[in-house]
Amino acid sequence: MTTIELQIQDNTFLRQFETKVGNYLAKIEYSLQERKIFLTKLIIPEEIRDDEFRESFIKAVLHHIEENNLRVVPTSPQIASFLRRNKQYKELLPVGIRI
């Protein structure tokens, strides 16, 4: 699988991570509480929705979160499923959270 390079924007006003592909906007909505970020909803337009894009988008957002020393609480089923399949991100989970 090839990795797609994405530019991630943290839209703090709308509380969502965004990336634009052509005329389409993919986003992950979040809620920030102390040093934890709750990833609540993954929205990818149907026109750009595929497994490779979804994986690359989630990885890019997790990298951004890691750079900002935050912990991830995945309340979105799609993001929780990604974290279950990709154990290398388990250090981003807060103490006591298992998925």
Predicted regions and their residues:
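Non-catalytic substrate-recognition and accessory regions of acyl/acetyltransferase enzymes
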Residues: 1-49, 64-73, 80, 97-99
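Conserved acetyl-CoA-binding loop-helix of GNAT-fold acetyltransferases
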Residues: 49-63
